[in-house]
Amino acid sequence: IHLNVSSKDERGLLGIAVTGNGESKQDDRLVFLYYTYCPKVKANVNSTSQGCGNYVYRYKFDTENSKLIEPQLILTLPALPGPSHNGGVLELDDKDENLYVAIGDLQSTRFNKNQTGYDTTVQNIVNGTPPDGRAGILRLTQDGKPIGNGRLGEEYPLNLYYAYGVKN
């Protein structure tokens, strides 16, 4: 596949996870890609475009043609103010098959004085904005659905948080 990935500083292809622990058939494999995309900009530009985001896509792996097919967007996360502290680890739990997505604080305002409104309460900022998916480890199904109630509440995105306060 060809992806137009923003690669400024710590943006880019952030994580890859593949299903199967040796027990599943090769043609049942799913591949998860986690990357930063900023529309209408060159890959290495430090964009503050509102279309900029970190995305998790699920693909089926076509073994016959060695291709990723049927892309499905399962999670959209912020990428601003960035371009640092995007995190990026994807992990699949072999036992329950949940997907864990790590995302950093995206270079919060304490370190980037020109940006405002990006510090959230999950970063232990008392007067921060409500959680928006950044600064945590998120847990979801392979279809992108929340798993029960999260650590912070029942509403989206609170129900995705498995851990919070993650800097990078």
Name what the model sees in each region.
Residues 108-113, 146-149:
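Short acidic/His/Gly/Ser-rich catalytic and metal-binding motifs that mark active-site loops
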Residues 28, 46, 50-55, 119-127, ...:
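A detector of repeated loop/turn-to-beta-strand junctions in beta-rich toroidal repeat architectures
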